[in-house]
């Protein structure tokens, strides 16, 4: 009986709850990519999507980087609070905290701006028929996963 109690207690301790990260510093290193496909909601046609991810892995796959996209002319601005949030349930799989949003863009050049806690990162995003190309202007806390992302993949 005592052994069963010990095994049960050890199992519960190992499982652990889905908890929020202990500090806002968990979003210090963010990687982003531009993708084309059915990434957010699946409308009739593919979308161009910005996906940000933390370097840290979390015990639930539905942690989110608290952020908001604003679009003005040819500027795409993502304002981040630095907080990581989670819904009411834990989707039990390991993964980074993420932010995904559809971008209302077509071919051409855009300013891509990330702002968080007084820091601003700036990139130029060039959309062509074949690819999404990223040029770094100024970077403090973000970095592209690549300088070029092929379309449709």
What kind of feature is each model-predicted range?
Residues 80-105:
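An anionic, turn-rich surface loop/hairpin at beta-sheet edges
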Residues 54-88:
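Contiguous segments within soluble domain cores/interaction surfaces
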Residues 40-62:
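Contiguous beta-strand segments within globular domains
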Residues 137-153:
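Compositionally biased low-complexity segments at domain edges in trafficked proteins
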Residues 84-89, 116-124:
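Short acidic/polar inter-strand loop motif in beta-rich domains
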Residues 1-16:
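Sec-dependent bacterial lipoprotein signal peptides
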Residues 13-33:
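Bacterial Sec-dependent N-terminal signal peptides
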Residues 106-117:
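A short tyrosine-centered beta-strand micro-motif
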């Amino acid at each position: 009986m005592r052994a069963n109690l010990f095994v049960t207690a050890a199992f519960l301790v190992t499982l652990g709850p889905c908890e929020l990260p202990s500090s806002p510093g968990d979003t210090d290193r963010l990687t982003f990519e531009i993708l084309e496909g059915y990434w957010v909601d699946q409308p009739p046609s593919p979308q161009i999507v910005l996906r940000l991810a933390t370097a840290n892995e979390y015990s639930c796959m539905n942690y989110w980087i608290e952020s908001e996209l604003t679009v003005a002319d040819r500027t795409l601005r993502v304002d981040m609070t630095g907080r990581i949030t989670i819904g009411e349930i834990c989707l039990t799989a390991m993964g980074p905290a993420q932010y995904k949003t559809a971008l209302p863009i077509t071919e051409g050049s855009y300013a891509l701006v990330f702002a968080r806690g007084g820091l601003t990162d700036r990139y130029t995003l060039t959309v062509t028929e074949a690819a999404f190309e990223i040029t770094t202007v100024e970077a403090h806390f973000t970095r592209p996963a690549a300088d070029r992302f092929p379309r449709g993949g």
